[in-house]
Amino acid sequence: MKKFIVLAALLAAGVAQAGGYTSLEYYDEHNRATGADNIKEAIVVGMKEGAMDYSLKMENSQTEFGNGSISQGMEIRVKRTFDMFYLGGRLGEKVTSSANFSHYAVDAGVKIPLGAGFTGDVGARYRNAFETGHSYETTRAHVAVGYALTKQDSVAVRWSRSWGDEEKDAVRLQYTRSF
């Protein structure tokens, strides 16, 4: 994991020089099947070139800070924007106390300008593990509202619902700084 952190730091430095962005994310999740609550935090480092968005996401999840089992994940993400809608793909690695496996995901959605610095986002994601037996096949729908604080700073809130192998409702708070 230390190598991934060093790699991410190097990537962040390179992206910052290329005119990229960094996002900090906080998730509050509720598992509808078990009633368990969970928190997750993530950092995303990325770069936009025209209609393309390339990013690396690292996340850490736990039932509460300092208590409970920890899971970690890393994803390489590519997204293409077409006028108002977008399509994306992800390749990732998930590490839990009992498993370590690779996965993929496909995203699609619509970004809607709402005016006065606000933007809406409605979309969906399909995700699954490459190898069978990991119980990771999940579809997620989301709705989000973002606000541009400045030309370089934005905040967003997203509500999502997942179903399949994960039955979760989640709220995500996000801060993004563009360079």
Predicted ranges, named:
Residues 45-49, 78-82, 93, 110-112, ...:
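Residue-level signature of outer-membrane beta-barrel architecture
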Residues 16-66:
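Short glycine/proline- and aromatic-enriched beta-strand/turn motifs that initiate or cap beta-hairpins
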Residues 82-129:
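Surface-exposed, polar helix/loop patches in the mature regions of secreted/periplasmic/lumenal proteins
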Residues 141-149, 167-179:
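Outer-membrane beta-barrel "beta-signal"
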Residues 20-24, 50-56, 82-89, 114-122, ...:
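Repeated loop/turn-to-beta-strand initiation elements of outer-membrane beta-barrel proteins
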Residues 1-23:
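Cleavable N-terminal export/targeting peptides
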Residues 37-41, 68-74, 95, 100-106, ...:
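Residues that define the transmembrane beta-barrel architecture of outer-membrane proteins
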Residues 27-33, 57-66, 92-99, 125-133, ...:
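Sequence/structural signature of outer-membrane beta-barrel proteins
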